[in-house]
Amino acid sequence: VERSVADAPSTLNFILPEAFLGEEDEERIAAIRENMYAALENDALSKLTRGFVFTERTTRTGTRRGIVAAIDLEAYSSEAGVSAPIRSSEEVVPERLAPRIAERKNAPLEFPHAILFYRDKKDRAVKMLLREELEKLYDFDLMEGGGHVTGWFVPEDLAAETAQLLHAKGEPVFAVADGNHSVAAAKAHWESVRATLKKEELANHPARFMLAELVNLYDASVVFYPIHRLLKEVDAEAFCDFFMKNVRCRREGTVLIPSLPAGAEGVKKTDELCERFVRENGGTIDYVHGAKELARRAAEEDCAGVQLAAMDKEDFFPALKGGVNLPKKTFSLGEAKEKRYYLEGREISYD
């Protein structure tokens, strides 16, 4: 990606890629901050008035439509057992937050990639926006086989009308589909800023909000894929015997297909057994996308796999009720190139 971008203007200059976390973070974050201030000073960014961005992204699974808007971090929680209008969908690991919090500290801008689900079976919000004559902001092919993306500006009055259609009954109203640690880091940063503010400054401070893409869970392009478990550096026969003593399975070579419920319950049971075996016998656990890839890697020496079923999207919101977090790696929304690219940004400080 760096070779492709070279010296061209790119949001790559404003982000800390996950692949680089833990590698010279301070130097990278300082460079990101400098790039942001330079872009602001040189008028390299197009500033919009208040509103939303309506996006249409074409990938191999179809066309995904989303609404890019600022969410109120006061309404968000990742704490277990805490009900909130905006919920994390999996447990947040504190150690993974530090570099992301540091990235936001003293930064004038954010360029997030988080996707949040909402529920709208009739797709009223998207259908309303499709009927409008909106100003087109961008329309181009994405790099690295990411498909095509188009964005339109939704002015403030229409944005307010659209927002009313996004609120389904019951909590959570929104749940993080991708970017759990990014949203949690934004909340942690806001809490540190909030502690320094006067009461009258709390309601509208830019750090209180975070930009995210809101996607209808019932969009036809939203597909939940399972994430399989791969055991490495283990006695494959011993692992298979151990797992099959605890769960009824079909066995295909060194791949086990357990008779467990799809989704959180099956993942939790699988993880408990895999972690117990590794704790008692050594080895490591890896996460693999695709049944064929799992079979290929499980056939390698000292490896074994557990093939899981895909979570039903209808079970997603009910599983989070009451502040419950899903086990890590419960589902995937597809390959890396199908995830959200970094496009829109927002000011998060008054500097």
PLM-predicted stretches and their roles:
Residues 1-351:
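Surface-exposed, charge/polar-rich loops and edge strands
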